[in-house]
């Protein structure tokens, strides 16, 4: 077997790789059908990190019934079906561009994450911020404000997912350099560690946190 996609936490690499493959094999086809139906056949990004997000990370979060209110930051055609993966949650989306509102959920906010305090969306149990660091949140001041806003909006023990590309110039603001993240603790998801690195040219990283 090839080397596993990501580094595990407390499990052997082969055990984790097999678990991921089994999960994807079991739900991948049904998710493809559901997502295509929900988007009217809209195109989806099939990079390794997007596949991991859609076929493992989001479904794992959706199975946690303590997650009752979700905010997904950043909207595009290929994200508009994600609302259907959280049938038991109140699902919000956020994007600063009015043109992207059509890709958002029924509960949508047109604004930046830094300004989340202006909107009555909390308390949230999960904030998903994938592909926003380096793609809109581009400097330390913006990142600090965004993480502070996320922390304020999250319920006690709420979860935060940061997905970012560890390649210049997208990694100009690394999570390690965001002091506001000191108010969170790393929080492994299922069989993965608190940091998941996905091989590929853009070196995507998923970081999982819980509000301290």
Each predicted region: which residue ranges?
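A short glycine-rich, Lys/Arg-flanked "PGG" loop and its adjoining helix->strand segment in the class I
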Residues: 142-156
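A conserved beta-strand element that flanks and buttresses the S-adenosyl-L-methionine
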Residues: 128
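Short amphipathic alpha-helix with an adjacent loop that forms part of the alpha/beta core around
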Residues: 60-62, 114-122
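Class I S-adenosyl-L-methionine
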Residues: 171-212
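Class I SAM-dependent methyltransferase Rossmann-like catalytic core
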Residues: 4-65
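Short catalytic micro-motifs in class I SAM-dependent methyltransferases
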Residues: 131-132
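Class I SAM-dependent methyltransferase SAM/SAH-binding core
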Residues: 69-116
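Conserved beta-strand signature within the Rossmann-like core of class I S-adenosyl-L-methionine
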Residues: 156-165
């Amino acid at each position: 077997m090839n080397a596993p996609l990501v580094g595990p936490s407390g499990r052997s690499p082969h055990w984790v790789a097999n678990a991921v493959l089994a999960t994807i094999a079991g739900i991948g086809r049904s998710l493809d059908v559901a997502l295509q139906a929900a988007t009217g056949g809209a195109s989806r990004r099939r990079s390794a990190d997007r596949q991991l997000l859609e076929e493992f990370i989001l479904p794992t979060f959706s199975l946690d019934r303590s997650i009752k209110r979700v905010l997904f930051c950043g909207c595009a055609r290929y994200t508009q079906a994600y609302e259907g993966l959280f049938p038991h949650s109140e699902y919000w989306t956020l994007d600063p561009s009015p043109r992207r509102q059509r890709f958002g959920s029924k509960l949508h906010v047109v604004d930046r994450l830094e300004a989340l305090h202006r909107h009555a969306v909390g308390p949230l149990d999960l904030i998903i911020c994938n592909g926003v660091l380096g793609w809109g949140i581009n400097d330390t001041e913006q990142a600090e404000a965004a993480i502070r806003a996320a922390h304020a909006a999250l319920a006690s023990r709420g979860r935060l997912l940061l997905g970012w590309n560890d390649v210049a110039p997208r990694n100009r603001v690394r999570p390690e350099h965001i002091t506001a993240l000191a108010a969170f603790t790393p929080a492994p998801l299922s069989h993965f560690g608190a940091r998941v690195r996905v091989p590929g040219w853009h070196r995507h990283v998923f970081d999982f946190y819980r509000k301290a």
